[in-house]
Amino acid sequence: LDASTYTVSAADGSDKFVLAFNCTNAKLKDKRVRQAIRYAINHKEIIASRGNVDYALGGPIPSVDPGYEDLTGLYPYNVDKAKELMKEAGYTTDKPLRLTLTYANTYGTELGDQLKSQLAKIGIDLKIDYVEFSTWLQNVHANGDYELSLVDHAESHDFYKWTTPDYYYHYDNKNVQALYAKALAATDEADSAKYLKQAAKAVSEDAPRSE
């Protein structure tokens, strides 16, 4: 390429690797379990294994969308805290919680292997179910039949998914829905972003997923 004609640049995008928790699943209704999983995930280790081309979000809104805030500080990597929460919920490494992670084999096996290893440290026996993407679309996305799921959501401005209980997350939080409604109704962009930021933080604190 002629450097005087073409310029190559890199920028943030809207892609979000989402580890989703089925909020209607009996095992995952316990917020302590969801929080423990958040604390137990070593994002730096996972990102390093992928060539350090990604970064942790900590929340449901990417940096290119209105309402973004770095929420990684809500659940920093803390195995001891994760173990404490799991013990409160009735699980230990000697009495593990068994969960299944379902995700498309197009993403390879490394992510699943890393999560299995990391969660084993806090008393979670994670089974990995690698499926064809078409199977994931039918079983997880369409039917909501899963416990944990991992997928790259590339859509921008898609916070509405966290306000739609019928979406495969099965997440139902009236406060989040009310804040999102205020964001949509706001006539000022700054006000809209403020409500989105509040809603995103509420979602992240509730721990129905990890990014």
Spans of features found by a protein language model:
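Ligand-binding "clamshell"
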Residues: 1-9, 143-146, 158-168
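Extracellular/periplasmic solute-recognition and catalytic clefts
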Residues: 1-24, 148, 152
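Second-shell loop/turn segments in exported
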Residues: 22-27, 33-36, 67-75, 103-105, ...
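Structural transition elements
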Residues: 55-88, 108-110
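Ligand/substrate-recognition segments at binding pockets and active sites
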Residues: 87-155
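Extracytoplasmic/peripheral linker and loop segments enriched in polar/acidic and small residues
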Residues: 127-136, 160-211
